[in-house]
Amino acid sequence: MKLKPFAATFLFCAAACLCATAQSAPADNKAVVTAFFRMLFQDKNVDKALQTYVDKNLIQHDPYLPDGASAMADFYGPYLEQHPMATADIKRMIAEDDLVVVHSLWKESPEDTGQAVVDIFRLRDGKIVEHWDVSQDIPENPANRNTMF
């Protein structure tokens, strides 16, 4: 008879631990993506950012890049060398389950009006395994006074 309360308590605690893990995963994923952005776009350490945070078999939905982390290295290495003042300023970040959405201001130089960019990352085991993105040039004469951020 004493086993039933013990079993119930054990199951409750196990369920609580699983829920806590599931709830902390989005925060962990946000931390991974934040560190990835910092290392790639602020530190300009392309190889280390990709080795640390991106799965080598990355599924890429950007129509200009093939799949794989090496394709990102082939693009961002030379690009950031040619544009050493390029920045990605994160304006907001949203995480749910295994997805992280980043809304950022991308500028090639301080004088650039920039682009509003939305990146969506899917993570597994602390690595980015899938990526989508869309971007829009920021107009010089917008139809309203609201910013894109």
Name every feature range the model reports, one short phrase each.
Residues 19-27:
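Boundary at the C-terminal end of the N-terminal hydrophobic targeting segment
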Residues 134-149:
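Low-complexity, intrinsically disordered terminal/linker segments enriched in charged
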Residues 8-17:
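Bacterial N-terminal signal peptides
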Residues 1-5:
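Positively charged n-region of N-terminal signal peptides that target proteins for export
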Residues 27, 31-56:
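Short acidic-aromatic low-complexity motifs
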Residues 102-109:
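Short beta-strand segments that buttress and anchor functional surface loops
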Residues 117-128:
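A short, surface-exposed beta-strand/turn
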